[in-house]
Amino acid sequence: VGFKAGVRDYRLTYYTPEYKTKDTDILAAFRMTPQPGVPAEEAGAAVAAESSTGTWTTVWTDGLTSLDRYKGRCYDIEPVAGEENQYIAYVAYPLDLFEEGSVTNLFTSIVGNVFGFKALRALRLEDLRIPPAYSKTFIGPPHGIQVERDKLNKYGRPLLGCTIKPKLGLSAKNYGRAVYECLRGGLDFTKDDENVNSQPFMRWRDRFLFVAEALFKSQAETGEIKGHYLNATAGTCEEMLKRAAFARELGAPIVMHDYLTGGFTANTSLAFYCRDNGLLLHIHRAMHAVIDRQRNHGMHFRVLAKALRMSGGDHIHAGTVVGKLEGEREVTLGFVDLLRDDYIEKDRSRGIYFTQDWVSMPGVLPVASGGIHVWHMPALTEIFGDDSVLQFGGGTLGHPWGNAPGAVANRVALEACVQARNEGRDLAREGNEIIRERSK
């Protein structure tokens, strides 16, 4: 009997506006710009097909499975207001298309191939809805916000951090000295920069040893628990886990990973190790702007944030709204909520296309970092709230009197702003005066 081969319009199979989404479906919102002459329905169906079961023609093995059960479906298309030939395509994927507990497989399927499709001029993944049936198969953050606060014995305020500068070139001993000065001045954390791994001028083992000495010395002086994000990122997973194990042996409370350059498989492996061994895990998003900065092509950071929450991390950098790096306030607060909260309602004004229910998955602390200083403290305290890490690099180390006075200035400003907020004062209007009063 045979079958009819040849090129076939995707919309005949994969555009299904009558489809009612299931609670177990993974839902995606794509911003797509079709090539001239390509109908929106065909473009949306092509996205659904190429990111699930489809290819450009009918193949005889289609008859050996149930396409209706496994195919992705473009179930809605809406034009983007104010944009010519740009649409939001909504696609539903059956849960059985994806391996449990694997962000790697999730992204390989949904964004691995379709972005090079010739029928599309541009394509951007704006949001994903992860159903509880799938999110419950992931490790999630190794510890989460509440457990971290309990480990550190620090409550009722944001945590303070600092990235050690210059990021490259210091010897291990001088690096440890810079860490000590910041921590004794009142910071909770210091941090390896994302590209500090194990270079000729400072091998990782030497850095870990001198930083551990700085941690214990500053803890003894201040009576507070201190931490330094020891970057365990390495060229292999085995080496990464070896570095994390050495940090644990030294008694360090937290390690760090560059999750996009290191990869989701490595990140999830490290998250399991951290949970099993009592280490907190700080996540840096190096390389994110390559993926998320273009407004019409790539992937929005809220998707990368959701992926990180599933893959595993206790902190992640999330922009500042007020600093040197790009970030719109409402959109930034939208993905901050997606990192911290259990249940987040759909809110298109904040870029949230789907209601997201994380059930019991622990939250991730957003880290505000990049071009911020002490005079941003009132705005940061108001924008990010208590469950956050405010990280000042140059804003600490750039103090004319040195690292420790820079750390003192940040701690004094933070405590002044938190107290004023708790007393009901208006930080937006009185913030600078509040800091001046406290610093006299």
From Swiss-Prot:
Record-listed Mg(2+) binding positions: 191, 193-194
Modified-residue entries (N6-carboxylysine), positions: 191
Catalysed conversion reaction: 2 (2R)-3-phosphoglycerate + 2 H(+) = D-ribulose 1,5-bisphosphate + CO2 + H2O; D-ribulose 1,5-bisphosphate + O2 = 2-phosphoglycolate + (2R)-3-phosphoglycerate + 2 H(+)
One Pfam family in the UniProt entry: RuBisCO_large
Reported cofactor(s): Mg(2+)
Active site: 165, 284
Modified residues (N6,N6,N6-trimethyllysine): 4
EC number(s) per entry: 4.1.1.39
Bilayer-crossing regions: none
Description of post-translational modifications: The disulfide bond which can form in the large chain dimeric partners within the hexadecamer appears to be associated with oxidative stress and protein turnover.
Enzyme class: lyase
Family matches, as InterPro entries: RuBisCO, RuBisCo_large_chain_AS, RuBisCO_lsu_C, RuBisCO_lsu_C_sf, RuBisCO_lsu_fd_N, RuBisCO_lsu_N_sf, RuBisCO_lsuI
Misc. remarks from the entry: The basic functional RuBisCO is composed of a large chain homodimer in a 'head-to-tail' conformation. In form I RuBisCO this homodimer is arranged in a barrel-like tetramer with the small subunits forming a tetrameric 'cap' on each end of the 'barrel'.
Membership in a protein family: Belongs to the RuBisCO large chain family. Type I subfamily.
Assembly: Heterohexadecamer of 8 large chains and 8 small chains; disulfide-linked. The disulfide link is formed within the large subunit homodimers.
Protein name in UniProt: Ribulose bisphosphate carboxylase large chain
Organism: Onoclea sensibilis (Sensitive fern)
